[in-house]
Curated annotation (Swiss-Prot):
Catalytic reactions of this protein: UDP-N-acetyl-alpha-D-muramate + NADP(+) = UDP-N-acetyl-3-O-(1-carboxyvinyl)-alpha-D-glucosamine + NADPH + H(+)
EC supergroup of this enzyme: oxidoreductase
Database matches in InterPro entries: FAD-bd_PCMH, FAD-bd_PCMH-like_sf, FAD-bd_PCMH_sub1, FAD-bd_PCMH_sub2, MurB, MurB_C, MurB_C_sf, Oxid_FAD_bind_N
Organism ancestry: Bacteria, Pseudomonadati, Pseudomonadota, Betaproteobacteria, Neisseriales
Active site: 165, 240 (proton donor), 336
Protein name (record): UDP-N-acetylenolpyruvoylglucosamine reductase
Role: Cell wall formation.
PANTHER family reported for this sequence: UDP-N-ACETYLENOLPYRUVOYLGLUCOSAMINE REDUCTASE (PTHR21071:SF4)
Length: 346
């Protein structure tokens, strides 16, 4: 087990690049080390931060508790039958690298989720999704360390209570389960999901008349994301800052009367998902800046660290966007990233 480090700079460990320090910090390289970590004097179950890629957090101040950085790596095939492959990835694996690995193996299911920042361990927590695919569609099970019993358990997909950007791990399981690995059920036969027009067009261009492959879809997704989204290594950000709001069919119909070109996505339960980026863009907020935090000038759904933004800059900007969108559309936006501490959340 790695030694504990004190007063550790967390700026490199959060993709928005907010300045903060951890009172205590330790890197976890193997899942079995959890049994020792929970016995450290610095460990407090109520305050410990289990940190992956730092692409879904906003550090609003120095972190007073222990930060455990999940660095456990490894990918292995578990089973293969009837055109399906179960493949396990450790929580510390970089998500995009894992996606590319599965595509290179000739497996299908994750290609639409290419270039999403973060680690494998975070994928079930947020139920990450893009271009018509969510993590829940391909997750078979999640292996966790149960802090209640201090044992390893495996939760089936149904046990994880997945919903749009939600899961057991954000609700009643938060603070109990530490995700150590995820098992994915992937196909050996490629079945494309091309419900988004821009993706379908990009794949058609790449495949140039031949039957498209999972790699074509992955390459197209990467090209689209690179054209729209800033690289967090160059311009700090946490990807999509707001969830796409879901409203009733009646509310959507009312909005359509005033905004007939409004993008909308009917859901199986009769509700309608709206495009948060479009709502923000209609409020002419692209490029709007408070202190060092700004709305990206090409993608309204992304807030960026333009000039050494403070935590307060980010909070004020997010609050301004929420208020402005609500004033115009009477639709409430909710932030995707976790505010730390949670008392700062809007």
């Amino acid at each position: 087990m790695q030694p504990i480090r004190y007063r550790t700079d967390l700026t490199p460990y959060n993709t928005f690049g907010l300045r903060a320090q951890a009172r205590a910090f330790i890197a976890l390289e193997h899942a079995d080390e959890l049994r020792d970590i929970v016995r450290l004097l610095e460990f407090d179950r109520d305050t410990v931060l289990w940190l992956g890629g730092g692409s879904n957090i906003l550090l609003m101040q120095d972190y007073a508790g222990l930060v455990v950085h999940m660095e456990n790596k490894g990918i292995r095939e578990i089973a293969r039958s009837d055109g399906m492959v179960l493949i396990e990835a450790q929580a510390g694996e970089i998500w995009h690298d894992f996606v590319l690995h599965t595509v290179a193996l000739g497996l299908s299911g994750l290609e639409n989720l290419s270039l999403i920042p973060g680690t494998v361990g975070a994928s079930p927590v947020q139920n990450i999704g893009a271009y018509g695919v969510e993590a829940k569609d391909v997750i078979h099970s999640v292996r966790c360390f149960d802090l209640d019993t201090e044992t390893f358990v495996e939760l089936a997909n149904a046990d994880c209570r997945f919903a749009y950007r939600e899961s057991l791990f954000k609700q009643e399981g938060k603070g109990r389960y530490v995700i150590v690995s995820v098992v994915f059920a992937l196909k050996t036969h490629f079945v494309p999901t091309l419900g988004y027009g821009d993706l379908a067009a990009a794949v058609a261009e790449l495949s140039a008349g031949r039957v498209p492959t999972a790699k074509d879809v992955s390459d197209a997704v990467c090209a689209i994301r690179n054209s729209k989204l800033p690289n967090p290594n160059v311009l700090g950000n946490v990807g999509s800052f707001f969830k796409n709001p879901v409203v009733s069919a009646e509310k959507a119909a009312t909005l359509l009367q005033r905004h007939p070109d409004m993008p909308r996505y009917p859901q199986p339960d009769g509700s309608v998902k709206l495009a948060a980026g479009w709502l923000i863009d209609q409020c002419r907020l692209k490029g709007f800046q408070i202190g060092g935090a700004a709305v990206h000038d090409r993608q309204a759904l992304v807030l960026v660290n333009k000039n050494n933004a403070s935590a307060n800059d980010v909070r004020q900007l997010a609050q301004h966007i929420k208020f402005t969108v609500f004033a115009r559309f009477q639709v409430e936006l909710h932030a995707e990233p976790n505010w730390l501490p949670a008392s700062f959340s809007l």
